[in-house]
A protein has these predicted regions:
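Extracytoplasmic "Venus flytrap"
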Residues: 27-43, 60-64, 164-167
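Short, polar/charged alpha-helical segment
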Residues: 36-55, 71, 173-177
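Ligand-binding "clamshell"
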Residues: 90-118, 204, 216-230
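Ligand-binding pocket segment of bilobal, Venus flytrap-like solute-binding proteins
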Residues: 154-227
Length: 296
């Protein structure tokens, strides 16, 4: 009798473990990188999936290469990626492509790896160089060609950039080649991404690296220098999902595409500012946006 009870208990335990594993396998893991825009996109995605009764968990605050590797390994099912990052960093494509060509190329290359790129948004979080609007009249800087002219004429212009920007192929090194100028080492300041904005706002530098959808651009009264030679790649933000996950939950394509078409530069700047400037919680900002756009 005791043996029979032990056998039954063991059977129930094993069945419980199998059921738990099956449930975990059905959970969609939403990933995200370590900056405000990604926290917002991950939270909106999580809330959307929850609203459609899809089991979901969220892992955010990851480095770019780490979240990509996690998705390729099946640890992350879904996150929002940038076309330029996938093209240059992950797929090592260095040729200059149009925004449409960039999207099509990464969709094709990543498709071979079991990753599906859904509908691209109109939010392009590309690199940009910014100046203070109050200085534009005096320094005459409106375009990157104007900036290049200023450096060629030996004007002292302090620039703030990140270590990543200074080292990447789509960063300062090749920007200087494209526009035929050179920033003297003494005038190029390397700092963390968030600090470039405050350095420019406080007048510690004259031009700074920013990201085109950052909420601080409008809040700090910056003007973006026009990339008149179209050097910077397109960084359209797009939901990317593992093929296996999409096959399990095909409704995700419609759900995520409905969100993607609502996003553009101005919208992301506003949402980012709500968190970074107005100090609203990511959860609140995400919920308000989804509700206002009839997505919840």
């Amino acid at each position: 009798m005791i043996k029979k009870l032990i056998h039954q208990a063991t059977t129930l335990f094993v069945a419980s473990v199998i059921a738990t594993a099956a449930l975990a396998a059905e959970t969609v893991t939403v990933g995200g990188k370590f900056f405000t825009e990604q926290y917002i996109l991950s939270e909106m995605t999580t809330q959307l999936l929850q609203a459609h009764s899809i089991p979901v968990k969220q892992i955010t605050g990851m480095g770019s290469s780490l979240v990509r590797k996690a998705q390729e390994n099946g640890e992350i099912d879904l996150y929002w990626e940038y076309t330029g990052t996938a093209l240059i960093v992950y797929n090592k494509v260095t040729e200059q492509l149009s925004p449409k060509q960039t999207y099509n190329r990464v969709k094709e290359l990543d498709g071979k790896k079991g990753l599906v790129w859904l509908k691209p948004s109109n939010a392009n979080n590309t690199f940009a160089l910014a100046v203070r609007k109050q200085d534009v009249a005096g320094n005459g800087l409106h375009t990157l060609s104007d900036l290049a002219d200023a450096y060629r004429n030996k004007k002292e212009i302090k620039m703030a950039g990140t270590a990543e920007f200074i080292g990447r192929s789509d960063g300062i090194k090749n920007l200087q080649k494209a526009y035929d100028f050179r920033v003297p080492r003494s005038q190029l300041k390397s700092m963390e991404a968030g600090l470039t904005y405050t350095a420019l706002k406080d007048g510690l530098v004259d031009v700074a690296l920013v990201y085109a959808t950052d909420g601080r651009i409008a809040a700090f009264d910056f003007e973006l220098l026009k990339d008149d030679k179209q050097f910077f790649p397109s960084y359209a933000v797009v939901p990317v999902i593992r093929k296996e996950t999409l096959e399990q939950y095909p409704e995700l394509e419609v759900i995520l595409n409905q969100l993607s078409v609502k996003l553009d530069d101005a919208t992301m700047q506003r949402l980012n500012a709500r968190v970074d400037i107005d100090k609203k919680s990511v959860r609140t900002v995400a919920a308000e946006f989804l509700t206002a756009n009839n997505l919840l």
